[in-house]
């Protein structure tokens, strides 16, 4: 697992191990629950993409970054990007999608499927993001190395995801789980129109950059 240096050696190792375990459980539960529905569409959802990014970083990339001294300078930038990407998942779900999900789940019979849905949603939308946030706050080193461009760099993943989703919607058709060519209602051009969706995406992007800049500014003010 992760080789840590500095004052949070043991805590960092424990948290990184827990994050890997939580990510594996969340992704596995999600895939298994929908296994009979053709999971080629699994990564049409940003939630799954961001949880996979967390898993790949803490299970594979972090080990390389922390053990190769020549790569140490990349750690604060990589860990900030991973934290912001997964916190975007948490914020969009909690602030935008949760009311509709809660309404749908409330009417489900209290079966094993219901428990899986509730547990999985909690893991991938809350437990993993907040665990990564705690790790970043307590264990991620050299946060003072972050600068305003980092507020843009981390958005590469959600931007790439958005571009690929709109391309997919044009050529691939309906996502079975969503009942639409678009994975999330606020991206549905057929419902809101291209101008409205562009406005929503632009506003969300500006908020993402502003959040990144605010965090970086706070770090430098509090140093």
Please tell me what each predicted stretch does:
Residues 1-223:
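Aromatic-rich, lipid-facing transmembrane alpha helices and their immediate juxtamembrane interface loops
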């Amino acid at each position: 697992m992760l080789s840590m240096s500095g004052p949070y050696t043991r805590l960092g190792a424990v948290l990184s191990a827990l994050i890997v375990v939580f990510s594996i459980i969340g992704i596995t539960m999600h895939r298994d629950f929908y296994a009979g529905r053709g999971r080629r569409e699994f990564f049409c959802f940003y939630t799954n993409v961001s949880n996979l990014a967390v898993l790949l970083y803490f299970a594979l990339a972090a080990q390389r970054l922390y053990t190769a001294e020549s790569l140490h300078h990349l750690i604060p930038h990589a860990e900030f990007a991973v934290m912001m990407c997964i916190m975007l998942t948490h914020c969009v779900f909690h602030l935008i999608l949760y009311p509709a999900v809660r309404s749908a789940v409330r009417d489900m019979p209290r079966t094993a499927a219901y428990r899986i849905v509730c547990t999985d949603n909690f893991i991938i939308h809350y437990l993993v993001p907040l665990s990564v946030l705690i790790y970043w706050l307590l264990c991620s080193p050299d946060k003072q190395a972050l600068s305003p461009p980092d507020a843009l760099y981390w958005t590469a993943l959600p931007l790439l995801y958005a571009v690929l989703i709109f391309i997919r919607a044009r050529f691939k058709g309906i996502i079975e789980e969503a009942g639409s060519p678009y994975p999330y209602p606020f991206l549905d051009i057929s419902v809101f129109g291209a101008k409205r969706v562009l406005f929503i995406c632009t506003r969300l992007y500006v908020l993402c950059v502003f959040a990144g800049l605010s965090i970086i500014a706070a770090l430098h003010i509090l140093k």
